[in-house]
């Protein structure tokens, strides 16, 4: 096991002088983020954890740890938390495109070395703060989990991703061993979907897990009306990458056109637009596809659409799926990952197999030709979106952490 003997020796010397974590009015929770700025669902979820702790336990001293200063840290200050900037090295990394197999040969030794200062710094922080609990956000940052284990502090790990299947990460210690270590370093592993939970349990059936769905409270909309003769407009929001499914969406639009049905597609997100524009041109649907960069305000884009899309190959949860539903849009999604936990086929949207452009096109053409069906699914989508409210999330989190 990673540095096992060394950790046991340190543990015997540093276990807070055999004193328990602080109880009562001076209780402290340390929450660790893997990022410093907004730009993904993980940062939003981290902020929601901070808000939950402050809302439900105002007397709790909450310390938020970030790898560096950024707008996430600045935003969380308003909730009355302390900010700590600390070295939070990762044990999972994106594969090098030009040589994806080189990591095991060159990466293990230097990556292992950079973990040690992070663990040492975390131990010193916990010795000073004497926290009641520690929470790590996302599966990629182990330092504070290891430090909490060394010092006998209850640690909870929030796993919001599959890691390997969705982000194609390379894990320093291997994927299976990493998941098992997450289990051993945590009192409870908090997953953001049952799909993620099942993926973790498949690798370590002894892992103690629970599921808490994220908060989604974007503005509620009214299901948009589509006038006779008006083209169906669909929208996909997310970082431009193969795993997020923009290419699948464009291919489905081409399939629909070949079947004699023109459907307009809007893509919104960060990343390179050029490959998507070239694909649309090659498939003869450039006139139907519009591509936009990232924006903090999607209200206008939602309002202009009739149907939302979730085309990811393996989405852990899919915050934008719920955002589209809250805007009054039925969602056509892939039957993979956590998406089927949100989209119920024929109730609030339609499902097709991951990577199946023909299947997605068929679902879109069904909604294009059946406006009453689309409207009924839109109503179901709005109702479904009510499941992801803040009070539900906060109550579940506080109960799991034993802070009620």
Regions found by a protein language model. Give the residues of each.
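Carbohydrate-associated surface elements
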Residues: 195, 215
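Conserved acidic donor-binding segment of nucleotide-sugar-dependent glycosyltransferases
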Residues: 345-346, 350-357, 366-371, 386
């Amino acid at each position: 096991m990673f540095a096992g003997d060394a950790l046991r020796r340190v543990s015997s010397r540093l276990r807070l002088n055999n004193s328990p974590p602080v109880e009562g009015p001076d209780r402290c929770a340390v929450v660790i983020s893997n990022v410093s700025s907004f730009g993904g669902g993980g940062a939003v979820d981290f902020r929601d954890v901070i808000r939950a702790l402050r809302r439900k336990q105002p007397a709790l001293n909450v310390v938020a740890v970030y790898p560096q200063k950024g707008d996430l840290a600045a935003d969380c200050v308003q909730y009355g938390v302390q900010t700590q900037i600390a070295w939070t090295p990762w044990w999972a990394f994106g594969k090098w495109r030009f040589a994806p197999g080189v990591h095991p040969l060159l990466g293990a030794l230097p990556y292992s070395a950079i973990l040690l200062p992070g663990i040492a710094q975390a131990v010193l922080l916990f010795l000073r703060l004497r926290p009641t609990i520690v929470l790590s956000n996302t599966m990629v940052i182990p330092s504070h989990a290891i430090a909490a284990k060394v010092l006998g502090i209850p640690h909870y790990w929030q796993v919001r991703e599959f890691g390997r299947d969705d982000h194609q990460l390379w894990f320093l210690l291997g994927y299976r061993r990493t998941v098992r270590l997450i289990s051993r370093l945590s009192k409870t592993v908090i997953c953001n979907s049952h799909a993620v939970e099942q993926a973790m349990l498949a690798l370590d059936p002894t892992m103690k897990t629970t599921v808490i769905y994220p908060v989604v409270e974007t503005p509620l909309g009214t299901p948009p009306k589509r006038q006779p003769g008006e083209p169906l407009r669909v929208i996909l929001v997310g970082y431009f990458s193969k795993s997020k499914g923009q290419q699948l969406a464009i291919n489905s639009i081409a399939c629909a056109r070949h079947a004699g049905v023109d459907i307009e597609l809007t893509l919104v997100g960060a990343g390179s637009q050029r490959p998507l524009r070239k694909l649309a041109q090659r498939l003869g649907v450039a006139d139907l596809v519009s591509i936009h960069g990232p924006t903090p305000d999607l209200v206008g884009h939602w309002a202009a659409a009739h149907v939302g899309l979730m085309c990811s190959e393996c989405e852990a949860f899919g915050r934008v799926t719920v955002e589209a539903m809250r805007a009054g849009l039925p969602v056509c999604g892939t039957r993979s990952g956590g998406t089927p936990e949100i989209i119920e086929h024929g109730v609030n949207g339609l499902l097709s197999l991951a990577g199946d452009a023909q299947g997605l096109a068929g679902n879109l053409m069904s909604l294009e030709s059946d406006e009453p069906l689309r409207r009924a699914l839109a109503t179901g989508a709005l109702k479904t979106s009510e499941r992801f409210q803040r009070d539900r999330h906060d109550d579940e989190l506080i109960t799991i952490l034993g802070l009620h």
